[in-house]
């Protein structure tokens, strides 16, 4: 997948900056947080790892889904082109919603992915929501499992332990989570100009 660049025929918009953000308390999908602006939202820089920025265990030890959200708009003059949203990395599972509709899912926190927006855009502001799941297991890279809070270190549920789930990593580095690399919108022409190539014996 080629990295997008700004050219005479391509628009490039970087969505890096401060987004609205909320830890899922288990009701995010039930209450359809992706359909409307997040209530009582925190702010979170993108790109960044949310569990390495905020103080307290609520963020650092969060297990499950979080929601990122912001408004986007696309100039009218580029709507005749192919409009693409590109996420360079989201750890570890992403669901992208535009104006409340699911338009893309991606598993894997270390590779870029993209989705065309043309069929989902409306005039004016568009509500972009990216739901991110940080759960690791033996189908993810890196691999891991599920443990209860403190039980992994204590060998069982002891005094002061909690049955709150948490990731049990099978690796020796921090599990950075969230939208960890830039999110961009770029455009390309709908068609490629006809180009005639003539081969010669010299290979030129």
Residue ranges and their predicted role:
Residues 5-6, 20-25, 62-193:
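Accessory beta-strand-rich segments of carbohydrate-active enzymes
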Residues 196-204:
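Single conserved hydrophobic/aromatic residue that forms the stacking wall/gate
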Residues 2-3, 51-55:
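Short glycine/threonine/proline-enriched tight-turn/helix- or strand-capping micro-motif at secondary-structure
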Residues 22-31, 54:
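Short, solvent-exposed loop/turn elements at domain surfaces
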Residues 10, 59-62:
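Short, solvent-exposed beta-strand/turn "edge" segments of beta-rich domains on protein surfaces
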Residues 13-21:
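Mature N-terminal segment immediately following signal peptide/propeptide cleavage
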Residues 30-40:
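Short Gly/aromatic-enriched secondary-structure transition segments
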Residues 1-12:
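N-terminal pre-domain segments of enzymes
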């Amino acid at each position: 997948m080629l990295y997008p660049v700004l050219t005479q025929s391509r628009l490039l918009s970087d969505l890096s900056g401060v987004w609205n953000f909320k830890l899922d308390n288990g009701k995010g999908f039930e209450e359809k947080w992706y359909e409307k602006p997040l209530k009582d939202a925190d702010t979170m820089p993108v790109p960044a790892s949310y569990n390495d920025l905020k103080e307290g265990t609520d963020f650092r030890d969060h297990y499950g889904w979080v929601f990122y959200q912001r408004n986007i708009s696309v100039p009218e003059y580029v709507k005749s082109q192919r409009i693409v949203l590109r996420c360079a990395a989201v750890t570890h599972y992403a669901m992208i919603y535009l104006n409340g509709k699911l338009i893309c899912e991606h598993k894997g926190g270390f590779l870029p992915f993209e989705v065309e927006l043309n069929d989902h855009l409306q005039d004016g502001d568009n509500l972009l929501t990216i739901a991110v799941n940080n759960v690791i297991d033996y189908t993810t890279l890196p691999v891991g499992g599920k443990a209860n809070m403190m039980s992994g270190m204590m060998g069982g549920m002891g005094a002061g332990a909690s049955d709150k789930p948490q990731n049990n990593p099978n690796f020796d580095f921090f599990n950075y989570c969230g939208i960890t690399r830039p999110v961009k919108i770029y455009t390309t022409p709908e068609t490629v100009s006809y180009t005639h190539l003539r081969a010669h014996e010299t290979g030129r």
